[in-house]
């Protein structure tokens, strides 16, 4: 009863922090000058992380097993993983746009956990015999940590694609508008307003420099986080193979979850290969990461909707 009450309190606190965090996050997106609000959002994510940690420990204490047996618990751990990734650049005091991605991921995932799932899904369950193993913590935690890192890195790549394509569309529209103007009109305007032209050119140059710096930063962080996630995913798949051999007598069975996990691993292996090829631009790598982002969600949610295969232990279970 004490554990249930404590979990209930922590759930409500985390929901309140998430609600406040979403409000502050939306405000800071439109008003960049309010530094105090941004700091409050950062502290809200840390508070949410502490609540999630308390929730995981509480469920572990009264269930008797590591809380990774259903969708609710796996999403809790996913939110916790997002918060961990978020706090690395935060405590290093580096101004990085990776925090925007990780904080929003933490807030919205935890919002889904606390308000988007039915109460029946939030109940702790007795482990089925196949899950009663010490490999549960190793395998599933590595998989979810890998998913979290890969999702964050992929979202940074998506942001890179948005900025790049917006720039390309803007250049195309400017060229189209320039062709509509007559050469004589442009020449007269340049002669009459040379100072304005210089100021405009200087402003455009500084804006392009800032955009290039932002793209470079997003590309660098995306590569680092995806590399980390790929390591976690590899460890998770290998540990799962060892566990499968102990439980089912075979290292690999090609059921839907295993197949899509392998597809996910292959997609991000291709991403890392493109990073080593100097002929590939960052945009090409970002497109591969975007495809990987879609595949992760198919593997995480879509396969479980089928309810078939060796990894199916009921509706919406992760592993």
UniProtKB/Swiss-Prot annotation:
Membrane topology category: Multi-pass membrane protein
Keywords assigned: Chloroplast, Cytochrome c-type biogenesis, Membrane, Plastid, Thylakoid, Transmembrane, Transmembrane helix
Pfam annotation, one family: Cytochrom_C_asm
Name the UniProt record assigns to this protein: Cytochrome c biogenesis protein CcsA
Protein location: Plastid, Chloroplast thylakoid membrane
Annotated transmembrane regions: 9-29, 44-64, 71-91, 143-163, 225-245, 259-273, 286-306
Record GO terms (molecular function): heme binding
Major site of localization recorded for this protein: plastid
Chain's role: Required during biogenesis of c-type cytochromes (cytochrome c6 and cytochrome f) at the step of heme attachment.
Keyword DNA damage: no
């Amino acid at each position: 009863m004490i554990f249930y009450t404590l979990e209930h309190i922590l759930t409500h606190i985390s929901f309140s922090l998430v609600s406040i965090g979403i409000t502050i996050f939306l405000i800071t997106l439109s008003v960049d000058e309010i530094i105090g609000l941004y700091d409050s959002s950062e502290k809200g994510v840390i508070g949410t992380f502490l609540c999630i940690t308390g929730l995981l420990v509480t469920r572990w204490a009264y269930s008797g097993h590591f809380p990774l047996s259903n969708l609710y618990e796996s999403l809790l751990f996913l939110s916790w993983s997002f918060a961990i990734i978020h706090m690395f650049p935060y405590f290093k005091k580096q101004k990085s746009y990776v925090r925007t991605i990780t904080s929003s991921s933490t807030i919205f995932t935890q919002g889904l956990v606390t308000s988007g799932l039915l109460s029946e899904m939030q109940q702790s369950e007795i482990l089925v015999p196949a899950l009663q193993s010490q490999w549960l913590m190793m395998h599933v935690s590595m998989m979810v940590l890998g998913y979290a890192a890969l999702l964050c890195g992929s979202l940074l790549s998506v942001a890179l694609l948005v900025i790049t394509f917006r720039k390309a569309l803007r250049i195309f529209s400017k060229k189209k508008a320039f062709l509509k103007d007559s050469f004589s009109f442009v020449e007269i305007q340049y002669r009459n307003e040379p100072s304005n032209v210089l100021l405009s050119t200087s402003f455009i140059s500084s804006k392009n420099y800032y955009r290039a710096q932002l793209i470079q930063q997003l590309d660098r962080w995306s590569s680092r986080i995806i590399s980390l996630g790929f390591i976690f995913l590899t460890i998770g798949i290998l540990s799962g193979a060892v566990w499968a051999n102990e439980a089912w007598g075979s290292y690999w069975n090609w059921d839907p979850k295993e197949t899509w996990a392998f597809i996910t691993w292959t997609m991000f292996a291709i991403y890392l290969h493109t990073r080593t090829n100097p002929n590939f631009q960052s945009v090409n790598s970002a497109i591969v990461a975007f495809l990987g982002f879609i595949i992760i969600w198919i593997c995480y949610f879509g396969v479980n909707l089928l309810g078939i295969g060796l990894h199916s232990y009921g509706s919406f279970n992760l592993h």
